[in-house]
A protein has these predicted regions:
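Exported/extracytosolic protein signature
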Residues: 1-553
Length: 553
């Protein structure tokens, strides 16, 4: 179309001669070809701007009017713009550099995906792949860099390696690792010939360190970068690669079926449950060791009720053994106990309450579990002994409480009026096989009743020459404005061969007024007094008739 290349104001331009006419609604296309320079860098954009310098149209007076667009394509056009700009751009872009980062982790198991998760001590293998587009030339200071997180949380296990198109880096290229930063240097003016892209692959390995910053749910995020300079400084980041830290989170619970009122020779069934949480970012609890310390006062038994020998396998524990010297049940070393997220290991075993026993005794046994982050022996794993160890250990306890004496009470007559004499009976049952210290029965009378005196006591069942009745001593009544306290001391009792039942009697009557406040005692009042028996697990005091022991519980 007659266009010619000219240098105008330092800019290369194509100028076309005036187009004679373009009819209303028509277009005129001007076609030309340009040659991209033989040497160009990637990610360059070449902007080509075309525009109309001016055009004319006929007027209704017979002359012609000249239109001059703003932002004129021809900066030397002397005419004053009088219409909006008439121009457009078309860009030519050279290929982008490709930069992709990927990783795999060394463990693939339930709760620990090789594609996105890692536990403490686990290895992470990274690759950075840079694609250098064919036909491009890299200017100066071209390099690929990667700094995986930090040397504290994710240290490199060794020097990084790199290849170019699957072969070792050629002369002029270099790779270095300084601290935690890996750098591949590309020679200045490096040319990627037309035809095929060049591929640089960097490989390196890190380890998730056993440090306080690495905990469940945290992420270790890494990203590579490539940079170079041609007409300007250029840079491109890779995708981010994020690896989530997973860890075990164990807990433990223990219970028994004789938590209250256990008696000598009772069989106690213990249940010990060691669990791993089902929460997010929880991995397998590896090589879990469970221990349970059995207190003195109960004896482990087998399914037939026979005492377990030292070193015996404890039934219901999956192979755990009994150490009589330390009174400890310990889980079997093999096979190792690995608890999946949401899973548990349950022990159910039995023990017999020793006979005789001391009334009111409390036998507490404590259990614990310890686990690790990685299966087998690994010097880099996290354990219960690590300085950061939340979720790697758990404890539990369970208590067997030995029962004591029991007491019932009756009154005759049950319906009375003011001043009517009443006979109260307090009946204490002393179970066989139990030793008692400071055994006491205490009765509290309300302020509407006056105590008239003790009338006696007797053993009504179970007492004999070989199973003697206790020695009973009466406490002096202690009268206050609100209550009257009376009681009986039975002292120290050796274990008996049969239950002994002791009956105490005393007299009382209903007052006409309440001792506290003086209000009258009215017909229909329900007058309640209570009695309780109690004891200690060793001798705590000597009988004093003027000091009734405080009522407990």
């Amino acid at each position: 179309d007659g266009g010619a290349c000219v240098a105008d104001s330092g800019v290369s331009r194509i100028k076309w001669p005036a187009i004679a006419a373009i009819n209303d609604g028509n277009t005129k296309s001007l076609t030309y070809h340009v040659l991209i320079p033989g040497t160009f860098g990637p990610e360059n954009t070449y902007v080509n701007t075309a525009g109309v310098r001016q055009y004319e149209s006929d007027t209704n007076t017979g002359g012609r009017y000249i239109y001059t667009p703003q932002n004129n394509i021809d900066p030397s056009n002397p005419r004053t713009p009088n219409i909006a700009r008439v121009d457009d751009d078309s860009n030519v872009k050279t290929p982008d550099v490709g930069l992709v980062k990927a990783r795999t982790t060394s463990i693939s198991e339930t709760g620990n995906s090789a594609t996105s998760q890692a536990t403490i001590g686990e290895l992470i293998d990274y690759t950075v792949t840079a694609t250098l587009p064919n036909g491009t030339t890299f200017g100066t200071n071209a390099k690929i860099t990667d700094t995986p997180n930090s040397a504290t949380t994710q240290p490199l296990t060794g020097p990084a390696t790199a290849t170019l198109n699957g072969s070792p880096l050629p002369v002029g290229w270099s790779i270095s690792t300084v601290g935690q930063t890996i750098t591949v240097n590309i020679p200045d003016g490096y040319v990627v010939p037309p035809g095929s892209d060049h591929t640089v692959v960097i490989s390196f390995q890190t380890r998730v360190a056993d440090v306080s910053a690495n905990v469940r749910g945290q992420s270790r995020t890494n990203q590579a970068n490539i940079s170079w300079t041609d007409s300007t400084a250029r840079s491109r980041n890779s995708n981010q690669v994020s690896t989530t830290i997973v860890e075990p989170l164990i807990s433990q619970a223990k219970s028994n079926n004789k938590s209250t009122n256990a008696q000598p020779n009772d069989i106690v069934t213990y249940t010990l449950v060691t669990s791993n949480s089902s929460a997010s970012n929880v991995s397998i609890a590896h090589d879990t060791v469970i221990k349970d310390v059995v207190p003195v006062g109960v004896t482990l038994v087998d399914g037939g009720g026979n005492p377990l020998a030292d070193g015996a396998i404890v039934p219901g524990t999956g192979g755990a053994t009994w150490d009589a010297a330390t009174r400890t049940i310990t889980s079997a070393a093999s096979p190792a106990i690995n608890i999946n997220p949401g899973g548990n290991v349950t022990w159910t075993y039995q023990a017999r309450v020793d006979s005789p026993a001391i009334a009111g005794s409390v036998f507490t046994n404590t259990a614990n579990a310890k686990t690790t982050s990685i299966n087998g022996s690994d010097a880099n794993e996290r354990t219960a002994s690590s300085s950061t160890n939340t979720g790697y250990s758990a404890n539990s306890s369970s208590t067997v409480r030995i029962g004591g004496s029991s007491v019932t009470k009756s009154v005759d007559p049950a319906w009375v009026t003011i001043g009517t004499p009443m006979t109260y009976k307090a009946t204490v049952t002393i179970p066989q096989g139990l030793e008692f210290f400071n055994l006491t029965a205490r009765d509290i009378l309300p302020d509407s009743i006056d105590f008239d005196g003790y009338t006696g006591w007797s053993c009504i069942s179970g007492c004999s020459g070989s199973n003697p009745a206790p020695t009973v001593q009466n406490y002096n009544p202690q009268v206050t404005s609100s209550v009257t306290n009376i009681g009986w001391d039975m002292g120290h009792l050796d274990p008996g061969a049969a239950d002994r039942v002791i009956e105490f009697t005393y007299k009382a009557h209903v007052r006409d007024t309440h001792r506290s406040g003086g209000a009258p005692v009215l017909a229909g009042e329900n007058i309640v007094n209570s009695v309780r028996s109690m004891s200690n697990t060793s001798n705590k005091f000597t009988f004093n008739p003027n000091s009734i022991p405080a009522q407990s519980g």
